């Protein structure tokens, strides 16, 4: 079950953890850097293990702190990656539109999600490097959309190089997660517990400690 977002900090209302997964070389790190720092580099360095960036955005008047984890795509690092599935509230499955094998492997990554992530985790399919010449494209847009439809998830084609749809894909999944969490909170509200005045005092004194603890999965 997804961990509830921390809301006790002064600089944000929600803390949402996102995970970027996909084969090595599909551009996960480039997407992350473009979204977090608005930078792009042609020099490619393979991610070793796990790295993350943070960016705070505003959605519907709420400050959303996005903690975005970039994972290594190599087989030998998948055991490291699986430990980070559990706390993820949203997962971006990334493939390279010029590399058909990276697209075909999305099904394997989806199996990993089903095995290790929360049942309620939000997912989105991302076809990266959409700026490449059509002669180099190996995966048609229609094929990506068909796979997304099969899984019942949203689909975007992006380019970290030109910044095509990068902002949109991250904000889209963040908005869907916020909506899910808000609906979950609303449903939980009627399930109150009657407490005595003594219990209330105890709860009040302990709430500060609880609120100061950020998400345990960070």
From Swiss-Prot:
Gene Ontology, cellular component aspect: cytosol; Golgi membrane; plasma membrane
Keyword field: Cell membrane, Golgi apparatus, GTP-binding, Lipoprotein, Membrane, Nucleotide-binding, Prenylation, Protein transport, Transport
A single BP term in Gene Ontology: protein transport
InterPro entries, A to Z: P-loop_NTPase, Small_GTP-bd, Small_GTPase, Small_GTPase_Rab
Pfam families: Ras
Region (Disordered): 182-218
Location relative to the cell: Golgi apparatus membrane; Cell membrane
Chain positions of motif Effector region: 44-52
CDD domains: Rab8_Rab10_Rab13_like
Coiled-coil residue windows: none
SMART domains registered for this protein in UniProt: ARF, RAB, RAN, RAS, RHO
The keyword Cell inner membrane is assigned to this record: no
Lipidation (S-geranylgeranyl cysteine): 214-215
Annotated GTP binding sites: 22-29, 70-74, 128-131, 159-160
Keyword Transcription among UniProt keywords: no
Residue ranges with Polar residues bias: 201-211
Family statement drawn from the similarity comment of this UniProt entry: Belongs to the small GTPase superfamily. Rab family.
Function according to Swiss-Prot or TrEMBL: Involved in membrane trafficking from the Golgi to the plasma membrane.
Identification of the protein by name: Ras-related protein RABE1e
Gene: RABE1E
């Amino acid at each position: 079950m997804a961990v509830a977002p921390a809301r006790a900090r002064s600089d944000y209302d929600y803390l949402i953890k996102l995970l970027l997964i996909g084969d090595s070389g599909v551009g996960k790190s480039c997407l992350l850097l473009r979204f977090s720092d608005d930078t792009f580099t042609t020099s490619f360095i393979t991610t070793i293990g796990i790295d993350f960036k943070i960016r705070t955005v505003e959605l519907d008047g709420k400050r959303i702190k996005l903690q975005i984890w970039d994972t290594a795509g190599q087989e030998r690092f998948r055991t490291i990656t699986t430990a980070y599935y559990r706390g993820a509230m949203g997962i971006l499955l990334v493939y390279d539109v010029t590399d058909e094998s990276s697209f075909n492997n999305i099904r394997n990554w989806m199996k990993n999600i089903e095995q290790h992530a929360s049942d309620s985790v939000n997912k989105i399919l991302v076809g990266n490097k959409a700026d490449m010449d059509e002669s180099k494209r190996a995966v048609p847009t229609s094929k990506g959309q068909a796979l997304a439809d099969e899984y019942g998830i949203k689909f975007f084609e992006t380019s970290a190089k030109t910044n095509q749809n990068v902002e949109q894909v991250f904000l889209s999944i963040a908005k869907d997660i916020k909506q899910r969490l808000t609906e979950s909170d609303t449903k939980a509200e009627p399930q109150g517990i009657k407490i005595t005045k003594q219990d209330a005092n105890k709860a009040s004194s302990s709430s500060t400690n609880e609120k100061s603890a950020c998400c345990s999965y960070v």
